[in-house]
From Swiss-Prot:
Organism of this sequence: Rhodobacter capsulatus (strain ATCC BAA-309 / NBRC 16581 / SB1003)
Gene: helD
A Pfam cross-reference name: CcmD
Stated name of the protein: Heme exporter protein D
Stretches that traverse the bilayer: 12-32
Keywords for this protein: Cell inner membrane, Cell membrane, Cytochrome c-type biogenesis, Membrane, Transmembrane, Transmembrane helix, Transport
């Protein structure tokens, strides 16, 4: 069920590919940053608990 893109097929498919790669990178960066912030928050909460 692939639509016919004619002479623009390579350009359109390359654009889709680039979009998917950038989207995957953005999602990965978001997940990595979220994990870092979670670890930092947990460490800060431990310091607050230990300080009384």
């Amino acid at each position: 069920m692939m639509p016919e893109f004619g002479k623009y097929a390579v350009t359109i498919l390359a654009s889709w590919g680039a979009t998917l790669v950038l989207l995957a990178g953005l999602i990965a960066a978001t997940l990595i940053r979220g994990a870092q912030v979670k670890r930092a928050l947990k460490a800060q909460e431990e310091r607050m608990k230990n300080d009384g």
